[in-house]
């Protein structure tokens, strides 16, 4: 029931007729499902409900009348999800509810307080505890631990939600008191930037003396151009290199003091200096370096520096893995301080919750192509994968952890998912990642988060409940919340008989009397002979005459659903307080009924069907005491299995179909680009150095296009960029079906548990098995297509045309030095280094076969990729050649007229002496 009018609707349902069976059904659902707290905050509505319940003749209504606080508040809940609950607002709502219940007078038909062995369920006691706890929550502030709910109110759903919400705030505020003790200026300002940006994002304290983001951004942008790869020198984008692009964008945003256009920003890179000086204990803030290495970008760093970086990273991750293993291995519970210490350790090296998600995305979108020749990269990435997976599930558990049943249920789901993701049946094994080097089971390592069940408190409440039906309802609630953490013998060693004994003045009934009475009972009867139903002979006789026959009809699936549920309810309710001999059988029957309702109402309760099998097994154990050869039919349980699993199968079939359709849709662009890249690698181009353009061979060859070299290079880069983006888009399509497949693995594991249940019911599994095969085939297809795309010519087209993207053989700087060469100061070293460059990278290996010209269709595609490609002469810049005369450019002469008083040259009056030369004289001169 949801909404603020839920209590009003329940009151109308109770007073609208339908008989005591219908009224008991409504009250049972009310006690199990609860009502929203806002629905209880109307004083008149609450009073009307209590007055209505006081007039009902059922046993459950008597309990609610006498123990109104426990009955109304125990299952009351806040509508908001746990992460959205404001503890202060919740405390105020709880305080108003306490005031309303305190103002309700005792009902006229009820005693002031029924006699009990203790005050566990006492209305006044519970109201005081609730009021006190509401005050404690209102005063709660981090970093203090949340106040512990006193007494039994810690079992109340709304109190659990408040306690849980406080713990979420407590864990979110748990940050290390000091991240970096002292500031040691690094060689490269990039490390300072990464530390400051990460610390500010995560709210970590930074050491004094470290520069601000503004200073560091200015230094990086203005003084370290080597750390940025401009768009003109890279085909990578925010799609193909999201982390590197985002890191550079953050720097430029701070530098520009505002928003900048993401497309215009470069990509953040690194040099040997960064690789050799970055500290490994901050490893995971270097996410852009790890992304680049995964995608074969080394930015001309030396092999030695790259391998040293990987080696130091592996050493650090080995130490971190050993610490985590030691801290969690074999630990059933950790203290809050120990849990915070693990969080601090992860945060200190850059493994925040958001960082774990970033790395998981990077790993999921790795290119399916050989990585650089780095010996340790596969091991390095295996450790990154394992530690980020651990961090991901650690933070998920931390965000859901509190000592409550609410947390227990959620944590079980998280750990089950972690176990499924880490299973060997998971097909995702990237070729660039080695087998997991840190061999521990994450679901076991994080099991310390699972809170222990408050067994003593649960047993105390169970013993204090005076109603057998309410005990059954409470046990159902406990089993639903705590599952296997609660022992099966919760009711043992407790007097399950009524609080008051029935005194009869007639002789005890005989077996024949009991059997005759049972034969006369009809489903739906509510009146009963108390002398008969209290007889020790009644349980066996009722089991033979009604319990087993009705169950057999239900389990053989011979009854219509509503009729079957009605008959089960009657078995649970008939003489519930008097027929004490039926209590052991009714307890599992009541749990079974509500598990069936969970399945039919699609509440998706965890393990509902498996728990139902447990209940049926326990029920037939009791039945066989009266009917030893009683067998459990399977048809109804199999139909429930199909009902529960069919929507899951259909939804996931639709998901994988959409994935395959999306994959099919994404293929044409990749194929088109791959074919075009392959064709370009087969062609022989002519280069005209005079006009700096490329002549492209086409069919027909009469007028081949002349493409300026700059436009040709731009087209090559665009093709490579488009191919990489299309490949990433193709792999990104699998993002939603990967978690879907994890859910499928969980269902398969659940099916395996069902098939190995002691009842040995053969549940149909063909649909799930076929669905798994479909997913595996889809993953295999994606892997092959992505690998093929990454190995096409177009994926690395700039590498094939690498000679066009080399630096100039004689750069402009060298030309300037040549023009201003000074023999007294300059050397020829720079010229020699420039001339030592190879003219070409090596012998080009063209693909064999294929056409030697571009078709018109391919030419149109090139023009679509870059409209300037075939714009012929219009795209060729005008020639810079000029017409020269036989005159020299004479620089302007600056004359100091104070020193030089004349404006004309006057030759000295010296006598010129000439020596006549003859041919004989010249010969004589050379001979000598």
Swiss-Prot record:
GO terms for biological process: virion assembly. Pfam families: Herpes_U30. One of its GO terms (cellular component) is host cell nucleus. It is found in: Virion tegument; Host cytoplasm; Host nucleus; Host Golgi apparatus, Host trans-Golgi network. InterPro entries: Herpes_U30, HSV_ITP. Keywords: Host cytoplasm, Host Golgi apparatus, Host nucleus, Virion, Virion tegument. Residues 482-928 are annotated as: Interaction with large tegument protein. Interacts (via C-terminus) with the large tegument protein/LTP (via N-terminus). Plays an essential role in cytoplasmic secondary envelopment during viral egress. Interacts with the capsid via the large tegument protein/LTP and participates in its transport to the host trans-Golgi network (TGN) where secondary envelopment occurs. Modulates tegumentation and capsid accumulation at the viral assembly complex. Belongs to the herpesviridae inner tegument protein family. This is Inner tegument protein.
